[in-house]
């Protein structure tokens, strides 16, 4: 990694990876802290991405063999991507803590931890589907709405879990992350209730899905903490 000092030529600054704008060692320490904070944001993105893909594919696969049809429509898939994009982008400005030791990419451990969390998220959606089908008699066109709302709500709460290596309440998320999460929750509560572009559920059922998603997903913080500690994340 090339390092240029403040009085270096423009050519040297342009080719360097880091430019020290002040004298002394403090600026070097600050650069290391910033780089480790950036790594933590990237790690959160990777864990969230892997967990999301595992959960999404698992729900579609198990749901198809269970109900013998797609449990999420093409429009629902598009809306899910839309909801996830904003919260994913907001990770770039999230509040994170730098580590005291150098960071390394341990792909195996990251994948194993993400796989375990993804499987738990699959079970969460299946439980919500079971409750909706057998206790609230949700079938037909309403089932894809139920699955969509659960996946969207769970994705918003999931990022609040995986962004923090300790307990999820150990640090406050960034403002952009909180705003995007709140906005997505409100938007899809309205979509699910009024049925503007998707089949509607009653407001009570939408709130039930929101509550179950919050309960199950935030409950994942306990196995997440153990997994991250075990795999050195």
Enumerate the predicted regions with their spans.
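Short glycine-aspartate micro-motif
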Residues: 2
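C-terminal transmembrane module of polytopic membrane proteins
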Residues: 133, 137, 145-233
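Membrane-embedded transport module
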Residues: 5-167, 193-194
């Amino acid at each position: 990694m090339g390092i240029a000092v403040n009085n270096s030529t423009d050519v040297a600054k342009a080719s360097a990876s880091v430019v020290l704008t002040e004298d002394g060692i403090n600026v070097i320490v600050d650069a290391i802290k910033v780089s480790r904070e950036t790594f933590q944001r990237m790690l959160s993105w990777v864990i969230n991405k892997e967990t999301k893909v595992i959960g999404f594919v698992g729900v579609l696969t198990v749901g198809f063999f269970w109900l013998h049809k797609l449990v999420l429509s093409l429009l629902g898939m598009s809306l899910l991507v839309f909801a996830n994009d904003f919260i994913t982008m907001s990770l770039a400005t999230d509040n994170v803590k730098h580590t005291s030791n150098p960071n390394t990419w341990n792909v195996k451990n990251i994948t194993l931890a993400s796989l375990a969390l993804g499987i738990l998220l699959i079970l969460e959606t299946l439980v919500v589907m079971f409750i909706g089908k057998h206790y609230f008699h949700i079938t037909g066109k309403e089932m894809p709405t139920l699955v969509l709302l659960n996946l969207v709500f769970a994705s918003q709460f999931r990022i609040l879990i995986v962004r923090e290596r300790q307990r999820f309440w150990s640090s406050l998320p960034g403002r952009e992350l909180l705003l995007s999460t709140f906005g997505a929750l409100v938007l899809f509560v309205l979509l699910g209730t009024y049925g503007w572009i998707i089949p509607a559920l009653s407001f009570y059922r939408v709130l039930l899905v929101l509550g179950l998603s919050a309960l199950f997903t935030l409950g994942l913080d306990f196995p997440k903490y153990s997994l991250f500690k075990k795999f050195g994340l």
